[in-house]
Amino acid sequence: MRAGSLVLFFNWRLGLGVQIILLWIMISPAAVALVGKPLQDLSTAEMLVLNDDLTLARRYLHPSIYSPHISSKLRSRFYYVKGYTFMKEGLHVSAGKELYRALEFDASNPDALYCLGQLYYHGRGYDEDVQMGLSFFREAADFSHQDAKFYLAYSLLIGKGTEQNEEKGLSALSDLVADGHVEAMMHLANHYRKTGYDQDRENFDRIKELYERALKAGSPEAALSLGVLYKEGKLVAKDLGLAFQYFTLASDMGSLQADVHIAHSLAAGLGIKRDYVAARRHYLEAADNDLAGGFLGLGYLYEFGLGVQIDLVKARAFYDLGAGTSSSALNEN
């Protein structure tokens, strides 16, 4: 592969530090043999992370992470990706160690700063320290990290770790929405919903518009929320058929909570023909993901013999499992 084509291949995928290295490669083709392999390994590792193949991703990071021929910025990226794989696995102590290593080689690595902010803000791997988390978010935001800006805006809105300032929080979220930030769209819409339904029509339309924008950007939670809106009929005209379509779309997009809504609609015949067998299948999917609504729905089916033989022992067991979980899809949207 020629040096110029190597630049074109990697430039879309990696950050500023990598681009600097690649520019050096263009100037010095002999350097390709020294740097090309680490870059290929890093790109492969990042693609594996997107596919949740985290152990294999870490294998590709070694031994290139120790190569003497890469820049400090590129080495920082290696450590960040390694730390991120541990975060995705819930191994937060290991994640923190790698993220701090990333900052040793590049103190301005915004992704590493942001992830460390998350660990402290939520108390994962470290004792919860919201102030420390916010300090990392501020540093990352200084480098235009949009997710870090979101956390700062959200903290202002709810007063977590800082003095509550709803006006500034909403303004900051609105700025992020203008930049296309999906989580900001969702939280802004949810905030307006939670402030009550005695608002004017303009706010109703804005809530719906925010969810629709988030859905176009690929948010399964937005599809789920739109389904709930049409099921409730409080902000829009009730349309149970359309609600079921949104629940199905949310499930297809990866929403685990959508299965409970689909199952409930099937069991009650809401917007779809009543089908207890199909309802049971979706309740089982939800239960497999430890959602309380899945267990409770199964308990209901077995208690009253809906699509199954009455079995009060099984019903009680499912009710107990549901009571022992903290999540309930029907109450989260």
Label every model-predicted segment:
Residues 67-68, 72-74, 106-108, 122-124, ...:
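Short helix-capping/linker turns of helical repeat alpha-solenoids
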Residues 27-84, 324, 328, 333:
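N-terminal leader/linker segments that initiate helical-solenoid repeat arrays
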Residues 63-64, 81-86, 113, 117-122, ...:
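Hydrophobic face of amphipathic alpha-helices that form TPR/SEL1-like repeat modules
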